[in-house]
Amino acid sequence: MSCVPVRGCRIGEGRPKVILPIVERTEAAILEKAAAFSTLCADCVEWRVDLFDAAADPGAVVRCLAKLRVLLKEKLLLVTLRTKEEGGSIPVSHEGYLRFLRTVLDTDCADLIDIEFFTAGTDLPALVQDAHTAGVKVVCSSHDFHKTPPKAEMVSRMVAMQQAGADLPKLAVMPQSRSDVLELLAATAEMTDHHPETPVITMSMGPLGAVSRLCGEAFGSAMTFANPGTASAPGQVGLDVVNTVLDSLRLN
């Protein structure tokens, strides 16, 4: 599996990198959380902008983003506007989504930006190019909160993300059975073994899929989300547990 270097962090190499989500609604609460996260044992902080009360105000987003960058110091900053269709909090038009992405890219504050595979559609390659021109790595994401697609479909989707130029394909799916969790892990292993051009980020959601968030080094998921107190998705595991288990399951 290849490696994506960002701020001295080598995503895809060794222990899965840990992401902490900021899900607070006000700027004051967001910045307070960022200051607390800056000292925790994690590699990356995700700001879920769709949960921000002022998400529709580009100026407020830019101002908050600049303050976040300072507070987080050398921790990676992943910026995400999760659309309602993919489990987020606010409806956003296609044009509004594109404007948001370009606003973030113009700030020089984000290390990584989440671009939804289906929301971006045919604009995905151009958006990836814009991000790379701005020096920002792309997490290209797809979420299914109802089911787990067949393995071949999951692999095909992540390969399509790679072909569009994404640095980190991300797939989150909901299991309805134990077999679904195994299907997600098998898709992850296939990407690692047969499509190693990029690292991938995968997870099976909910309590049934929680194990998939902890065994990334064995199966090939390069990053995992931990719950620092408030989860941003079902099945996220507490930060202390994540760090303990990731250390226990080290391959080297």
Per-range role (PLM):
Residues 1-5, 238-241:
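Short N-terminal or domain-adjacent regulatory/targeting segments
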Residues 2-7, 14-17, 198-199, 219-221:
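Generic structural motif recognizing short loop/turn segments at the entrances and edges of beta-strands
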Residues 3, 10-133, 143-147:
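Active-site beta->alpha loop and helix N-cap motifs at the rims of alpha/beta catalytic domains
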Residues 7-9, 213:
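A generic local secondary-structure boundary/capping motif
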Residues 112, 117-252:
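Catalytic alpha/beta core domains of metabolic enzymes, predominantly
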